């Protein structure tokens, strides 16, 4: 997938349309400060927990201080989930990796703080 591509090759055309509709809805909810209630409506508590865990997986993989097996023990995630995160991170566009580094690896910067 190229950095500017909106389509996910892993999804069908219809699923891509649904995905892009969700992304647009999420963007609008953020603009109107409704993202938390929207995500609570659309995602189960387990799904919200899983997303939080995936963010931590990406953060720790970028930090590079733990092996995938150590991450499995530390985060309680399956090795397949960690491996998928690692492979996705390797395939991510450089601009996204740089942005994630700024967001996730800045020790004093809380998530969501764009200042």
From Swiss-Prot:
GO terms for cellular component: cytoplasm. Residues 68-91 bind DNA. This protein is an aporepressor. When complexed with L-tryptophan it binds the operator region of the trp operon (5'-ACTAGT-'3') and prevents the initiation of transcription. The complex also regulates trp repressor biosynthesis by binding to its regulatory region. InterPro entries: Trp_repress, Trp_repress_bac, Trp_repressor/repl_initiator, TrpR-like_sf. It holds the Pfam family Trp_repressor. Gene3D superfamilies: TrpR-like (1.10.1270.10). This is Trp operon repressor. GO terms for molecular function: DNA-binding transcription factor activity; sequence-specific DNA binding. It comes from the Bacteria. Keywords: Cytoplasm, DNA-binding, Repressor, Transcription, Transcription regulation. GO terms for biological process: negative regulation of DNA-templated transcription. Its main location: cytoplasm. The gene is trpR. Homodimer. It is found in: Cytoplasm. Belongs to the TrpR family.
């Amino acid at each position: 997938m190229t950095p500017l591509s909106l389509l996910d090759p892993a999804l069908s055309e219809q699923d891509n349309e649904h995905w892009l509709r969700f992304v647009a809805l999420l963007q609008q909810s953020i603009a109107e400060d409704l993202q938390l209630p929207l995500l609570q409506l659309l995602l189960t508590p387990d799904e919200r927990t899983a997303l939080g865990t995936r963010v931590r997986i990406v953060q720790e993989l970028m930090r590079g201080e733990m092996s995938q097996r150590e991450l499995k023990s530390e985060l309680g995630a399956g090795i397949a989930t960690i491996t998928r995160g690692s492979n996705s991170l390797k395939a991510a566009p450089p601009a996204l990796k740089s942005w994630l580094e700024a967001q996730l690896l800045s020790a004093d910067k809380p998530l969501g703080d764009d200042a």
